[in-house]
Curated annotation (Swiss-Prot):
Modifications made to the protein after synthesis: Autophosphorylated on both His and Ser residues in the presence of manganese. Loss of His autophosphorylation in the presence of both manganese and magnesium.
Tree of life domain: Eukaryota
Induction profile: By ethylene.
EC number(s) stated in the UniProt entry for this protein: 2.7.11.-, 2.7.13.3
Span of the signal peptide: none
Protein name, per record: Ethylene response sensor 1
Localization per Swiss-Prot or TrEMBL: Endoplasmic reticulum membrane
Record field: catalytic activity: ATP + protein L-histidine = ADP + protein N-phospho-L-histidine
Phosphohistidine carried by residues: 353
The organism of origin for this protein: Arabidopsis thaliana (Mouse-ear cress)
Gene3D superfamilies per the UniProt record, alphabetical: 1.10.287.130, 3.30.450.40, Histidine kinase-like ATPase, C-terminal domain (3.30.565.10)
Cofactor: how and how many bound: Binds 1 copper ion per dimer.
Gene: ERS1
GO cellular component: endoplasmic reticulum; endoplasmic reticulum membrane
Protein backbone atom coordinates (compact mmCIF):
# COMPACT_ATOMS: atom_id res chain seq x y z
CA UNK A 1 0.00 0.00 0.00
CA UNK A 2 2.97 2.31 0.64
CA UNK A 3 4.11 2.10 -2.98
CA UNK A 4 0.53 2.72 -4.33
CA UNK A 5 -0.28 6.34 -5.36
CA UNK A 6 -3.84 6.16 -4.13
CA UNK A 7 -6.35 8.37 -2.41
CA UNK A 8 -8.23 7.00 0.54
CA UNK A 9 -11.87 7.93 0.96
CA UNK A 10 -13.04 9.47 4.22
CA UNK A 11 -16.64 8.36 4.00
CA UNK A 12 -18.17 5.48 5.81
CA UNK A 13 -19.14 3.06 3.09
CA UNK A 14 -21.66 1.42 5.34
CA UNK A 15 -23.53 4.69 5.83
CA UNK A 16 -27.00 4.63 4.27
CA UNK A 17 -26.65 8.15 2.84
CA UNK A 18 -23.49 7.16 1.04
CA UNK A 19 -25.28 4.24 -0.48
CA UNK A 20 -28.07 6.51 -1.70
CA UNK A 21 -25.55 8.91 -3.23
CA UNK A 22 -23.80 6.02 -4.93
CA UNK A 23 -27.01 4.70 -6.43
CA UNK A 24 -28.11 8.22 -7.46
CA UNK A 25 -24.85 8.90 -9.29
CA UNK A 26 -25.21 5.61 -11.12
CA UNK A 27 -28.76 6.43 -12.21
CA UNK A 28 -27.82 10.01 -13.16
CA UNK A 29 -24.96 8.74 -15.29
CA UNK A 30 -27.25 6.21 -16.92
CA UNK A 31 -29.83 8.92 -17.65
CA UNK A 32 -27.22 11.31 -19.02
CA UNK A 33 -25.88 8.66 -21.35
CA UNK A 34 -29.37 7.67 -22.60
CA UNK A 35 -30.56 11.22 -23.38
CA UNK A 36 -28.06 11.81 -26.26
CA UNK A 37 -28.99 8.45 -27.73
CA UNK A 38 -32.65 9.45 -27.71
CA UNK A 39 -31.85 12.85 -29.26
CA UNK A 40 -29.78 11.26 -32.00
CA UNK A 41 -32.58 8.77 -32.75
CA UNK A 42 -35.34 11.40 -33.03
CA UNK A 43 -33.16 13.81 -35.04
CA UNK A 44 -32.51 11.09 -37.57
CA UNK A 45 -36.24 10.37 -37.76
CA UNK A 46 -37.02 14.07 -38.29
CA UNK A 47 -37.10 15.29 -41.90
CA UNK A 48 -36.04 18.80 -40.95
CA UNK A 49 -34.21 20.09 -37.87
CA UNK A 50 -32.52 23.53 -38.13
CA UNK A 51 -30.26 23.32 -35.02
CA UNK A 52 -28.22 20.12 -35.41
CA UNK A 53 -24.94 21.74 -34.36
CA UNK A 54 -26.60 23.07 -31.20
CA UNK A 55 -27.90 19.58 -30.52
CA UNK A 56 -24.40 18.16 -30.90
CA UNK A 57 -23.05 20.72 -28.44
CA UNK A 58 -25.87 20.04 -26.01
CA UNK A 59 -25.28 16.28 -26.37
CA UNK A 60 -21.58 16.73 -25.54
CA UNK A 61 -22.55 18.71 -22.46
CA UNK A 62 -24.90 15.95 -21.30
CA UNK A 63 -22.35 13.19 -21.98
CA UNK A 64 -19.67 15.04 -20.01
CA UNK A 65 -22.11 15.60 -17.16
CA UNK A 66 -22.91 11.89 -17.19
CA UNK A 67 -19.18 11.08 -17.28
CA UNK A 68 -18.54 13.12 -14.13
CA UNK A 69 -21.27 11.26 -12.30
CA UNK A 70 -20.02 7.94 -13.65
CA UNK A 71 -16.40 8.63 -12.58
CA UNK A 72 -17.69 9.81 -9.23
CA UNK A 73 -18.70 6.21 -8.52
CA UNK A 74 -14.99 5.37 -8.00
CA UNK A 75 -14.57 8.33 -5.72
CA UNK A 76 -16.51 6.53 -2.97
CA UNK A 77 -13.70 3.94 -2.68
CA UNK A 78 -9.96 4.12 -2.61
CA UNK A 79 -8.86 5.31 -6.01
CA UNK A 80 -5.69 6.18 -7.80
CA UNK A 81 -4.43 9.58 -8.86
CA UNK A 82 -5.27 8.75 -12.48
CA UNK A 83 -8.92 8.49 -11.52
CA UNK A 84 -8.70 11.90 -9.89
CA UNK A 85 -7.03 13.37 -13.00
CA UNK A 86 -9.72 11.86 -15.26
CA UNK A 87 -12.37 13.25 -12.94
CA UNK A 88 -10.76 16.68 -13.10
CA UNK A 89 -10.48 16.64 -16.89
CA UNK A 90 -14.11 15.54 -17.19
CA UNK A 91 -15.31 18.32 -14.92
CA UNK A 92 -13.19 20.96 -16.67
CA UNK A 93 -14.46 19.80 -20.07
CA UNK A 94 -18.00 19.74 -18.74
CA UNK A 95 -17.56 23.26 -17.36
CA UNK A 96 -16.26 24.56 -20.70
CA UNK A 97 -18.97 22.87 -22.72
CA UNK A 98 -21.71 23.91 -20.29
CA UNK A 99 -20.57 27.55 -20.40
CA UNK A 100 -20.44 27.50 -24.20
CA UNK A 101 -23.86 25.88 -24.31
CA UNK A 102 -25.24 28.46 -21.88
CA UNK A 103 -23.91 31.28 -24.05
CA UNK A 104 -25.31 29.68 -27.15
CA UNK A 105 -28.73 29.20 -25.58
CA UNK A 106 -28.97 32.95 -25.11
CA UNK A 107 -29.36 33.21 -28.89
CA UNK A 108 -31.25 29.98 -29.43
CA UNK A 109 -33.92 30.19 -26.72
CA UNK A 110 -35.70 33.26 -28.27
CA UNK A 111 -35.98 31.36 -31.55
CA UNK A 112 -37.28 28.33 -29.70
CA UNK A 113 -39.79 30.47 -27.84
CA UNK A 114 -40.93 32.07 -31.13
CA UNK A 115 -41.77 28.62 -32.40
CA UNK A 116 -44.79 28.68 -30.15
CA UNK A 117 -45.82 32.05 -31.49
CA UNK A 118 -45.41 30.74 -35.00
CA UNK A 119 -47.45 27.75 -34.05
CA UNK A 120 -50.21 30.01 -32.78
CA UNK A 121 -49.95 32.13 -35.92
CA UNK A 122 -50.16 29.07 -38.14
CA UNK A 123 -53.08 27.79 -36.13
CA UNK A 124 -54.81 31.14 -36.55
CA UNK A 125 -54.15 31.05 -40.28
CA UNK A 126 -55.45 27.50 -40.42
CA UNK A 127 -58.62 28.62 -38.65
CA UNK A 128 -59.01 31.49 -41.11
CA UNK A 129 -58.52 29.11 -44.02
CA UNK A 130 -61.12 26.81 -42.51
CA UNK A 131 -63.54 29.72 -42.24
CA UNK A 132 -62.79 30.81 -45.80
CA UNK A 133 -63.22 27.26 -47.00
CA UNK A 134 -66.52 27.08 -45.17
CA UNK A 135 -67.54 30.39 -46.74
CA UNK A 136 -66.55 29.12 -50.18
CA UNK A 137 -68.52 25.93 -49.62
CA UNK A 138 -71.47 28.01 -48.43
CA UNK A 139 -71.23 30.24 -51.48
CA UNK A 140 -71.03 27.20 -53.73
CA UNK A 141 -74.07 25.76 -52.02
CA UNK A 142 -75.87 29.09 -52.39
CA UNK A 143 -74.90 29.26 -56.04
CA UNK A 144 -76.12 25.71 -56.57
CA UNK A 145 -79.46 26.55 -55.00
CA UNK A 146 -79.69 29.75 -57.06
CA UNK A 147 -78.98 27.81 -60.25
CA UNK A 148 -81.59 25.23 -59.33
CA UNK A 149 -84.13 27.93 -58.58
CA UNK A 150 -83.21 29.86 -61.72
CA UNK A 151 -83.62 26.72 -63.82
CA UNK A 152 -87.01 26.10 -62.27
CA UNK A 153 -88.07 29.71 -62.79
CA UNK A 154 -86.92 29.95 -66.40
CA UNK A 155 -88.52 26.74 -67.57
CA UNK A 156 -91.61 28.79 -68.36
CA UNK A 157 -92.41 32.31 -69.52
CA UNK A 158 -95.85 32.50 -67.93
CA UNK A 159 -95.64 35.10 -65.16
CA UNK A 160 -98.02 33.32 -62.77
CA UNK A 161 -96.15 30.03 -63.19
CA UNK A 162 -92.87 31.86 -62.57
CA UNK A 163 -94.07 33.30 -59.28
CA UNK A 164 -95.68 30.05 -58.15
CA UNK A 165 -92.51 28.07 -58.96
CA UNK A 166 -90.39 30.62 -57.09
CA UNK A 167 -92.41 30.33 -53.90
CA UNK A 168 -92.51 26.52 -54.02
CA UNK A 169 -88.77 26.14 -54.68
CA UNK A 170 -87.84 28.67 -51.99
CA UNK A 171 -90.09 26.88 -49.54
CA UNK A 172 -88.39 23.54 -50.28
CA UNK A 173 -84.83 24.90 -50.26
CA UNK A 174 -85.10 27.01 -47.10
CA UNK A 175 -87.75 24.90 -45.29
CA UNK A 176 -90.06 27.89 -44.95
CA UNK A 177 -93.30 28.00 -43.01
CA UNK A 178 -94.77 30.53 -45.42
CA UNK A 179 -93.69 32.53 -48.46
CA UNK A 180 -95.76 35.19 -50.24
CA UNK A 181 -95.53 37.90 -52.86
CA UNK A 182 -97.16 41.32 -52.60
CA UNK A 183 -97.73 43.12 -55.92
CA UNK A 184 -98.60 46.82 -56.37
CA UNK A 185 -102.20 47.59 -57.26
CA UNK A 186 -103.42 49.33 -60.41
CA UNK A 187 -103.66 52.64 -58.59
CA UNK A 188 -100.22 52.24 -57.04
CA UNK A 189 -101.58 53.08 -53.56
CA UNK A 190 -101.72 49.54 -52.16
CA UNK A 191 -99.81 46.27 -52.15
CA UNK A 192 -102.03 43.29 -52.91
CA UNK A 193 -101.29 39.71 -51.93
CA UNK A 194 -101.00 37.89 -55.27
CA UNK A 195 -99.35 34.52 -54.46
CA UNK A 196 -98.82 32.47 -51.28
CA UNK A 197 -97.16 29.16 -50.55
CA UNK A 198 -99.75 27.51 -48.29
CA UNK A 199 -102.89 29.51 -49.21
CA UNK A 200 -103.73 29.99 -45.52
CA UNK A 201 -104.69 33.60 -46.18
CA UNK A 202 -106.97 34.84 -48.92
CA UNK A 203 -105.24 36.18 -52.01
CA UNK A 204 -106.21 39.79 -52.69
CA UNK A 205 -105.59 41.20 -49.23
CA UNK A 206 -104.02 44.64 -49.37
CA UNK A 207 -101.88 46.94 -47.25
CA UNK A 208 -101.19 50.66 -47.81
CA UNK A 209 -98.03 51.32 -49.77
CA UNK A 210 -97.11 54.39 -47.71
CA UNK A 211 -96.16 52.41 -44.58
CA UNK A 212 -92.65 53.29 -43.28
CA UNK A 213 -91.52 49.67 -43.37
CA UNK A 214 -92.58 49.37 -47.04
CA UNK A 215 -90.71 52.56 -47.98
CA UNK A 216 -87.66 51.20 -46.19
CA UNK A 217 -87.89 47.95 -48.15
CA UNK A 218 -88.28 49.83 -51.44
CA UNK A 219 -85.12 51.84 -50.72
CA UNK A 220 -82.93 48.83 -49.95
CA UNK A 221 -81.69 46.18 -52.37
CA UNK A 222 -80.84 43.77 -49.53
CA UNK A 223 -83.06 41.33 -47.67
CA UNK A 224 -84.26 42.87 -44.40
CA UNK A 225 -85.64 41.47 -41.16
CA UNK A 226 -89.13 42.74 -40.41
CA UNK A 227 -91.20 42.33 -37.23
CA UNK A 228 -93.61 39.43 -37.02
CA UNK A 229 -96.34 41.96 -36.25
CA UNK A 230 -95.81 43.81 -39.55
CA UNK A 231 -98.90 43.81 -41.83
CA UNK A 232 -96.83 42.14 -44.53
CA UNK A 233 -96.09 39.21 -42.16
CA UNK A 234 -99.72 38.52 -41.22
CA UNK A 235 -99.68 35.67 -43.73
CA UNK A 236 -98.03 33.31 -41.22
CA UNK A 237 -99.81 30.85 -38.90
CA UNK A 238 -100.61 31.72 -35.25
CA UNK A 239 -97.55 31.69 -32.99
CA UNK A 240 -99.18 30.06 -29.94
CA UNK A 241 -96.75 29.13 -27.18
CA UNK A 242 -93.74 29.31 -29.49
CA UNK A 243 -91.59 32.38 -29.92
CA UNK A 244 -92.32 34.41 -33.09
CA UNK A 245 -90.38 33.16 -36.11
CA UNK A 246 -87.93 35.33 -37.97
CA UNK A 247 -89.37 37.08 -41.02
CA UNK A 248 -87.37 38.42 -43.95
CA UNK A 249 -88.56 40.62 -46.82
CA UNK A 250 -86.88 41.66 -50.05
CA UNK A 251 -88.01 43.87 -52.90
CA UNK A 252 -88.50 42.47 -56.44
CA UNK A 253 -87.94 45.09 -59.18
CA UNK A 254 -90.65 45.19 -61.83
CA UNK A 255 -88.43 45.85 -64.82
CA UNK A 256 -90.85 45.61 -67.76
CA UNK A 257 -94.50 45.18 -66.84
CA UNK A 258 -95.99 48.24 -68.53
CA UNK A 259 -98.00 46.23 -71.06
CA UNK A 260 -99.31 43.52 -68.74
CA UNK A 261 -103.07 43.37 -68.83
CA UNK A 262 -104.78 42.25 -65.68
CA UNK A 263 -106.11 43.45 -62.39
CA UNK A 264 -103.08 42.23 -60.46
CA UNK A 265 -100.48 44.23 -62.39
CA UNK A 266 -99.99 47.99 -62.44
CA UNK A 267 -98.73 50.26 -65.17
CA UNK A 268 -95.43 51.10 -63.50
CA UNK A 269 -93.13 51.20 -66.56
CA UNK A 270 -90.14 49.77 -64.72
CA UNK A 271 -90.35 52.09 -61.68
CA UNK A 272 -92.21 49.90 -59.14
CA UNK A 273 -91.36 47.05 -56.81
CA UNK A 274 -93.07 43.98 -55.49
CA UNK A 275 -92.23 42.58 -52.03
CA UNK A 276 -91.44 38.97 -51.23
CA UNK A 277 -91.99 37.85 -47.61
CA UNK A 278 -90.35 34.67 -46.21
CA UNK A 279 -91.19 33.20 -42.78
CA UNK A 280 -89.20 30.51 -40.94
CA UNK A 281 -90.93 27.74 -38.93
CA UNK A 282 -92.55 28.84 -35.67
CA UNK A 283 -90.50 26.59 -33.36
CA UNK A 284 -87.89 29.36 -33.12
CA UNK A 285 -84.94 26.98 -33.47
CA UNK A 286 -83.78 28.37 -36.81
CA UNK A 287 -82.25 31.73 -37.55
CA UNK A 288 -81.58 33.38 -40.86
CA UNK A 289 -77.98 32.91 -41.98
CA UNK A 290 -76.01 35.20 -44.26
CA UNK A 291 -75.84 32.81 -47.18
CA UNK A 292 -79.61 32.26 -46.98
CA UNK A 293 -80.20 36.00 -47.16
CA UNK A 294 -77.85 36.18 -50.12
CA UNK A 295 -79.80 33.36 -51.74
CA UNK A 296 -83.05 35.27 -51.27
CA UNK A 297 -81.56 38.42 -52.82
CA UNK A 298 -80.26 36.52 -55.84
CA UNK A 299 -83.60 34.79 -56.34
CA UNK A 300 -85.39 38.15 -56.20
CA UNK A 301 -83.14 39.44 -58.99
CA UNK A 302 -83.75 36.31 -61.07
CA UNK A 303 -87.50 36.65 -60.59
CA UNK A 304 -87.30 40.26 -61.79
CA UNK A 305 -85.44 39.18 -64.93
CA UNK A 306 -87.84 36.29 -65.57
CA UNK A 307 -90.87 38.57 -65.20
CA UNK A 308 -89.26 41.02 -67.61
CA UNK A 309 -88.74 38.25 -70.16
CA UNK A 310 -92.32 37.10 -69.70
CA UNK A 311 -93.56 40.65 -70.24
CA UNK A 312 -91.48 41.02 -73.39
CA UNK A 313 -92.81 37.70 -74.67
CA UNK A 314 -96.41 38.70 -74.01
CA UNK A 315 -95.78 42.04 -75.68
CA UNK A 316 -94.22 40.37 -78.72
CA UNK A 317 -97.11 37.90 -78.92
CA UNK A 318 -99.58 40.77 -78.66
CA UNK A 319 -97.68 42.63 -81.39
CA UNK A 320 -97.65 39.46 -83.49
CA UNK A 321 -101.42 39.11 -83.12
CA UNK A 322 -101.89 42.75 -84.08
CA UNK A 323 -99.57 42.28 -87.05
CA UNK A 324 -101.52 39.22 -88.16
CA UNK A 325 -104.75 41.20 -87.92
CA UNK A 326 -103.21 44.05 -89.88
CA UNK A 327 -101.87 41.63 -92.49
CA UNK A 328 -105.31 40.08 -92.78
CA UNK A 329 -106.88 43.53 -93.18
CA UNK A 330 -104.20 44.52 -95.71
CA UNK A 331 -104.71 41.31 -97.64
CA UNK A 332 -108.44 41.93 -97.69
CA UNK A 333 -107.86 45.53 -98.79
CA UNK A 334 -105.45 44.31 -101.48
CA UNK A 335 -108.04 41.89 -102.79
CA UNK A 336 -110.65 44.64 -102.80
CA UNK A 337 -108.21 46.97 -104.57
CA UNK A 338 -107.46 44.30 -107.17
CA UNK A 339 -111.19 43.82 -107.70
CA UNK A 340 -111.59 47.58 -108.05
CA UNK A 341 -108.71 47.73 -110.54
CA UNK A 342 -110.25 44.91 -112.56
CA UNK A 343 -113.63 46.65 -112.46
CA UNK A 344 -112.02 49.93 -113.54
CA UNK A 345 -110.17 48.24 -116.37
CA UNK A 346 -113.35 46.56 -117.51
CA UNK A 347 -115.16 49.90 -117.36
CA UNK A 348 -112.41 51.65 -119.30
CA UNK A 349 -112.40 48.93 -121.92
CA UNK A 350 -116.17 49.23 -122.34
CA UNK A 351 -115.99 53.03 -122.38
CA UNK A 352 -113.16 52.98 -124.90
CA UNK A 353 -115.11 50.78 -127.28
CA UNK A 354 -118.72 51.70 -126.63
CA UNK A 355 -118.34 55.47 -126.22
CA UNK A 356 -115.41 56.58 -128.35
CA UNK A 357 -116.56 54.72 -131.47
CA UNK A 358 -120.00 56.43 -131.74
CA UNK A 359 -118.42 59.71 -130.57
CA UNK A 360 -116.03 59.68 -133.51
CA UNK A 361 -118.96 59.04 -135.81
CA UNK A 362 -120.83 62.02 -134.36
CA UNK A 363 -117.76 64.25 -134.76
CA UNK A 364 -117.26 63.14 -138.36
CA UNK A 365 -120.92 63.65 -139.32
CA UNK A 366 -121.03 67.03 -137.58
CA UNK A 367 -117.93 68.16 -139.45
CA UNK A 368 -119.46 67.05 -142.76
CA UNK A 369 -122.72 68.85 -142.00
CA UNK A 370 -120.85 72.09 -141.33
CA UNK A 371 -119.45 71.96 -144.85
CA UNK A 372 -122.98 72.01 -146.32
CA UNK A 373 -125.33 74.97 -146.67
CA UNK A 374 -127.13 75.45 -143.36
CA UNK A 375 -129.30 78.12 -141.86
CA UNK A 376 -127.79 80.14 -139.01
CA UNK A 377 -129.88 78.30 -136.42
CA UNK A 378 -128.88 74.92 -137.83
CA UNK A 379 -125.20 75.92 -137.94
CA UNK A 380 -125.32 76.96 -134.27
CA UNK A 381 -126.89 73.65 -133.34
CA UNK A 382 -124.36 71.61 -135.36
CA UNK A 383 -121.44 73.62 -133.93
CA UNK A 384 -122.78 72.98 -130.42
CA UNK A 385 -123.01 69.26 -131.17
CA UNK A 386 -119.45 69.24 -132.57
CA UNK A 387 -118.09 71.23 -129.62
CA UNK A 388 -119.76 68.97 -127.06
CA UNK A 389 -118.63 65.85 -128.89
CA UNK A 390 -115.03 67.07 -128.99
CA UNK A 391 -115.21 67.85 -125.26
CA UNK A 392 -116.56 64.41 -124.41
CA UNK A 393 -113.92 62.75 -126.62
CA UNK A 394 -111.20 64.78 -124.93
CA UNK A 395 -112.47 63.84 -121.46
CA UNK A 396 -112.57 60.17 -122.39
CA UNK A 397 -109.01 60.30 -123.75
CA UNK A 398 -107.79 62.13 -120.64
CA UNK A 399 -109.40 59.62 -118.29
CA UNK A 400 -107.94 56.70 -120.22
CA UNK A 401 -104.46 58.21 -120.29
CA UNK A 402 -104.61 59.15 -116.60
CA UNK A 403 -105.72 55.65 -115.63
CA UNK A 404 -102.87 54.13 -117.59
CA UNK A 405 -100.44 56.54 -115.91
CA UNK A 406 -101.66 55.65 -112.44
CA UNK A 407 -101.44 51.89 -112.89
CA UNK A 408 -98.08 52.15 -114.67
CA UNK A 409 -99.25 50.54 -117.89
CA UNK A 410 -98.54 53.60 -120.05
CA UNK A 411 -95.08 53.39 -121.62
CA UNK A 412 -93.25 56.05 -123.60
CA UNK A 413 -92.07 55.52 -127.16
CA UNK A 414 -88.46 56.57 -127.72
CA UNK A 415 -88.19 57.16 -131.45
CA UNK A 416 -86.58 59.91 -133.55
CA UNK A 417 -88.90 62.73 -134.62
CA UNK A 418 -88.76 66.24 -136.02
CA UNK A 419 -88.75 68.63 -133.10
CA UNK A 420 -89.40 71.81 -135.05
CA UNK A 421 -92.23 70.17 -136.99
CA UNK A 422 -94.10 69.50 -133.74
CA UNK A 423 -94.19 73.18 -132.81
CA UNK A 424 -95.22 74.19 -136.31
CA UNK A 425 -98.03 71.63 -136.28
CA UNK A 426 -99.23 72.83 -132.86
CA UNK A 427 -99.37 76.41 -134.15
CA UNK A 428 -101.26 75.28 -137.25
CA UNK A 429 -103.83 73.50 -135.07
CA UNK A 430 -104.24 76.27 -132.49
CA UNK A 431 -104.15 79.27 -134.83
CA UNK A 432 -107.66 78.77 -136.32
CA UNK A 433 -109.16 78.46 -132.83
CA UNK A 434 -107.28 81.53 -131.59
CA UNK A 435 -108.28 83.58 -134.63
CA UNK A 436 -111.94 83.08 -133.74
CA UNK A 437 -111.21 84.97 -130.46
CA UNK A 438 -108.96 87.42 -132.35
CA UNK A 439 -105.86 86.23 -130.49
CA UNK A 440 -102.43 86.39 -132.05
CA UNK A 441 -100.11 83.36 -131.83
CA UNK A 442 -96.32 83.49 -131.84
CA UNK A 443 -93.72 80.73 -132.14
CA UNK A 444 -90.16 81.45 -130.98
CA UNK A 445 -87.57 78.71 -131.47
CA UNK A 446 -84.02 79.22 -130.24
CA UNK A 447 -81.22 79.03 -132.78
CA UNK A 448 -79.54 76.08 -131.04
CA UNK A 449 -82.69 73.96 -131.04
CA UNK A 450 -81.90 70.68 -132.84
CA UNK A 451 -83.96 69.66 -135.86
CA UNK A 452 -84.42 66.09 -134.69
CA UNK A 453 -84.65 64.48 -131.24
CA UNK A 454 -85.43 61.10 -129.69
CA UNK A 455 -88.47 60.75 -127.47
CA UNK A 456 -92.23 60.25 -127.39
CA UNK A 457 -93.50 62.61 -130.09
CA UNK A 458 -97.16 61.89 -129.41
CA UNK A 459 -97.03 62.67 -125.66
CA UNK A 460 -94.94 65.79 -126.20
CA UNK A 461 -97.39 67.15 -128.75
CA UNK A 462 -100.35 66.20 -126.54
CA UNK A 463 -98.80 68.12 -123.64
CA UNK A 464 -98.13 71.25 -125.72
CA UNK A 465 -101.63 71.17 -127.25
CA UNK A 466 -103.24 70.77 -123.84
CA UNK A 467 -101.37 73.78 -122.45
CA UNK A 468 -102.09 75.85 -125.57
CA UNK A 469 -105.77 74.88 -125.39
CA UNK A 470 -105.96 76.13 -121.80
CA UNK A 471 -104.23 79.35 -122.81
CA UNK A 472 -106.77 79.96 -125.60
CA UNK A 473 -109.64 79.02 -123.31
CA UNK A 474 -108.77 81.55 -120.57
CA UNK A 475 -107.55 84.42 -122.78
CA UNK A 476 -110.11 86.94 -124.05
CA UNK A 477 -107.75 89.29 -125.86
CA UNK A 478 -104.06 89.71 -126.51
CA UNK A 479 -101.66 87.02 -127.61
CA UNK A 480 -100.38 83.51 -126.97
CA UNK A 481 -96.75 82.63 -127.60
CA UNK A 482 -94.65 79.47 -127.50
CA UNK A 483 -90.95 79.71 -126.67
CA UNK A 484 -88.74 76.63 -127.09
CA UNK A 485 -85.08 76.53 -126.08
CA UNK A 486 -82.38 74.24 -124.73
CA UNK A 487 -81.66 74.50 -121.00
CA UNK A 488 -78.03 75.16 -120.15
CA UNK A 489 -76.45 73.13 -117.31
CA UNK A 490 -76.06 76.23 -115.14
CA UNK A 491 -79.73 77.11 -115.68
CA UNK A 492 -80.79 73.61 -114.62
CA UNK A 493 -78.94 73.97 -111.33
CA UNK A 494 -80.73 77.26 -110.59
CA UNK A 495 -84.23 75.77 -110.76
CA UNK A 496 -85.75 75.99 -107.24
CA UNK A 497 -87.53 72.64 -107.41
CA UNK A 498 -87.07 69.88 -104.81
CA UNK A 499 -88.89 67.44 -107.14
CA UNK A 500 -86.57 67.81 -110.14
CA UNK A 501 -83.10 66.25 -110.21
CA UNK A 502 -81.49 66.79 -113.63
CA UNK A 503 -78.85 64.30 -114.78
CA UNK A 504 -76.33 65.70 -117.24
CA UNK A 505 -75.17 63.41 -120.03
CA UNK A 506 -73.76 63.59 -123.55
CA UNK A 507 -76.56 61.38 -124.88
CA UNK A 508 -79.49 63.70 -124.11
CA UNK A 509 -80.47 67.33 -123.57
CA UNK A 510 -83.19 69.21 -121.68
CA UNK A 511 -85.86 71.04 -123.69
CA UNK A 512 -87.63 74.00 -122.09
CA UNK A 513 -91.07 75.00 -123.43
CA UNK A 514 -92.89 78.13 -122.23
CA UNK A 515 -96.48 79.08 -123.12
CA UNK A 516 -97.29 82.71 -122.29
CA UNK A 517 -100.73 84.29 -122.49
CA UNK A 518 -102.44 87.55 -121.56
CA UNK A 519 -105.40 85.80 -120.02
CA UNK A 520 -107.22 86.15 -116.72
CA UNK A 521 -104.31 84.92 -114.58
CA UNK A 522 -104.63 83.18 -111.24
CA UNK A 523 -103.92 83.71 -107.56
CA UNK A 524 -100.56 82.37 -106.41
CA UNK A 525 -102.15 80.21 -103.69
CA UNK A 526 -104.45 78.58 -106.27
CA UNK A 527 -101.64 77.42 -108.59
CA UNK A 528 -101.19 73.98 -106.88
CA UNK A 529 -104.89 73.27 -107.49
CA UNK A 530 -104.30 73.39 -111.24
CA UNK A 531 -102.44 70.06 -111.07
CA UNK A 532 -105.13 68.33 -108.98
CA UNK A 533 -107.45 65.91 -110.72
CA UNK A 534 -111.07 67.04 -111.24
CA UNK A 535 -110.40 70.36 -109.49
CA UNK A 536 -110.65 73.81 -111.08
CA UNK A 537 -109.75 76.84 -108.97
CA UNK A 538 -112.49 79.43 -108.62
CA UNK A 539 -111.29 83.03 -108.52
CA UNK A 540 -112.99 86.41 -108.43
CA UNK A 541 -113.20 86.59 -112.21
CA UNK A 542 -115.66 84.68 -114.29
CA UNK A 543 -113.95 81.41 -115.28
CA UNK A 544 -117.04 79.45 -116.00
CA UNK A 545 -115.47 77.27 -118.66
CA UNK A 546 -116.18 73.67 -119.51
CA UNK A 547 -113.71 70.90 -118.71
CA UNK A 548 -113.08 68.08 -116.29
CA UNK A 549 -109.96 69.45 -114.63
CA UNK A 550 -107.74 66.69 -115.98
CA UNK A 551 -105.68 68.48 -118.63
CA UNK A 552 -102.88 70.02 -116.56
CA UNK A 553 -102.78 67.06 -114.15
CA UNK A 554 -102.30 64.79 -117.13
CA UNK A 555 -99.65 67.10 -118.61
CA UNK A 556 -97.65 67.09 -115.38
CA UNK A 557 -97.76 63.29 -115.29
CA UNK A 558 -96.51 63.14 -118.89
CA UNK A 559 -93.72 65.62 -118.14
CA UNK A 560 -92.64 63.66 -115.08
CA UNK A 561 -92.68 60.45 -117.09
CA UNK A 562 -90.34 62.11 -119.61
CA UNK A 563 -87.86 62.97 -116.84
CA UNK A 564 -88.88 66.60 -116.47
CA UNK A 565 -90.70 69.13 -114.34
CA UNK A 566 -93.66 71.47 -114.91
CA UNK A 567 -94.67 74.67 -113.18
CA UNK A 568 -96.99 77.69 -113.67
CA UNK A 569 -96.30 81.34 -112.84
CA UNK A 570 -98.75 84.23 -112.59
CA UNK A 571 -98.55 87.68 -111.08
CA UNK A 572 -102.22 87.65 -110.18
CA UNK A 573 -105.67 88.10 -111.67
CA UNK A 574 -105.92 89.73 -115.11
CA UNK A 575 -102.11 89.67 -115.46
CA UNK A 576 -101.69 86.65 -117.65
CA UNK A 577 -100.02 83.35 -116.99
CA UNK A 578 -96.89 81.44 -118.02
CA UNK A 579 -96.89 77.64 -118.13
CA UNK A 580 -93.41 76.09 -118.41
CA UNK A 581 -92.08 72.58 -118.52
CA UNK A 582 -88.71 70.88 -118.99
CA UNK A 583 -88.32 67.42 -120.47
CA UNK A 584 -85.37 65.22 -121.30
CA UNK A 585 -84.93 64.21 -124.96
CA UNK A 586 -82.30 62.07 -126.60
CA UNK A 587 -79.82 63.53 -129.04
CA UNK A 588 -80.34 62.20 -132.56
CA UNK A 589 -76.87 61.71 -134.09
CA UNK A 590 -77.82 60.14 -137.45
CA UNK A 591 -75.21 60.10 -140.23
CA UNK A 592 -75.45 62.82 -142.87
CA UNK A 593 -75.82 60.29 -145.67
CA UNK A 594 -79.03 58.96 -144.14
CA UNK A 595 -80.61 62.32 -143.33
CA UNK A 596 -82.69 62.13 -146.50
CA UNK A 597 -84.08 58.69 -145.66
CA UNK A 598 -84.80 59.83 -142.09
CA UNK A 599 -86.73 62.80 -143.42
CA UNK A 600 -88.79 60.51 -145.66
CA UNK A 601 -89.43 58.19 -142.69
CA UNK A 602 -90.61 61.07 -140.52
CA UNK A 603 -92.79 62.46 -143.29
CA UNK A 604 -94.47 59.10 -143.77
CA UNK A 605 -94.90 58.75 -140.04
CA UNK A 606 -96.56 62.18 -139.77
CA UNK A 607 -99.07 61.21 -142.43
CA UNK A 608 -100.08 57.94 -140.79
CA UNK A 609 -100.00 58.78 -137.02
CA UNK A 610 -103.42 58.52 -135.33
CA UNK A 611 -103.68 61.70 -133.23
CA UNK A 612 -106.57 61.70 -130.77
CA UNK A 613 -106.87 65.28 -129.53
Amino acid sequence: MESCDCFETHVNQDDLLVKYQYISDALIALAYFSIPLELIYFVQKSAFFPYKWVLMQFGAFIILCGATHFINLWMFFMHSKAVAIVMTIAKVSCAVVSCATALMLVHIIPDLLSVKNRELFLKKKADELDREMGLILTQEETGRHVRMLTHGIRRTLDRHTILRTTLVELGKTLCLEECALWMPSQSGLYLQLSHTLSHKIQVGSSVPINLPIINELFNSAQAMHIPHSCPLAKIGPPVGRYSPPEVVSVRVPLLHLSNFQGSDWSDLSGKGYAIMVLILPTDGARKWRDHELELVENVADQVAVALSHAAILEESMHARDQLMEQNFALDKARQEAEMAVHARNDFLAVMNHEMRTPMHAIISLSSLLLETELSPEQRVMIETILKSSNLVATLISDVLDLSRLEDGSLLLENEPFSLQAIFEEVISLIKPIASVKKLSTNLILSADLPTYAIGDEKRLMQTILNIMGNAVKFTKEGYISIIASIMKPESLQELPSPEFFPVLSDSHFYLCVQVKDTGCGIHTQDIPLLFTKFVQPRTGTQRNHSGGGLGLALCKRFVGLMGGYMWIESEGLEKGCTASFIIRLGICNGPSSSSGSMALHLAAKSQTRPWNW
